[in-house]
């Protein structure tokens, strides 16, 4: 089995703008098949910044944000299902579109808005210029085997870069910072010092 180099080409807005991988296998009928996400990508420590949000996507998110904060806000929470004997399922592996959709739809709580937004995000995905970056996020997330939801995982991975955020898009910065201001009190800290 012969592997060629995993190549990265950078640009001004992100360290990784394009990802190309060439795998060469011997021409046997039983040649091994290897997907990109099965490779050991632990050497990729610097994920690219979240791509600049396109004007179409900004408008879409603004519309759904307005719907979610308006009249429909009474139906925000779905009824809770009984989880008495809940079996832990193996997490579904993400692809680039699932990562993209998960990141941009996470702040919409209304179920009907979520469903419609998901369909509209599928259309936006077809026009997305940075599909490879979202695919890279998904590959790294799958490889990490994290128990965190994708959006939270991405936020944690990119939190080191928040201080030196270079994107010219304040919407993206705001998306990352939405949950970064939550303070959790450690109630066990005092108890452990007493014993």
From Swiss-Prot:
Cited function: Mating type proteins are sequence specific DNA-binding proteins that act as master switches in yeast differentiation by controlling gene expression in a cell type-specific fashion.
A single GO molecular-function term is:
DNA binding, bending
Known InterPro entries for this protein? ALPHA1_Saccharomycetales, MATalpha_HMGbox
Q: Which organism is it from?
A: Pichia angusta (Yeast)
Q: Does the keyword Cytoplasm apply?
A: no
Q: What GO biological process term is on the record, naming one?
A: positive regulation of mating-type specific transcription, DNA-templated
Cellular localisation: Nucleus
UniProt miscellaneous comment: In P.angusta, all mating-type proteins (MATA1, MATALPHA1 and MATALPHA2) are encoded on one idiomorph, consistent with the fact that P.angusta is a homothallic haploid in which any strain can mate with any other strain.
**Name of this protein:** Mating-type protein ALPHA1
Which superkingdom, per the lineage? Eukaryota
**What does the record give as the DNA-binding region?**
89-145
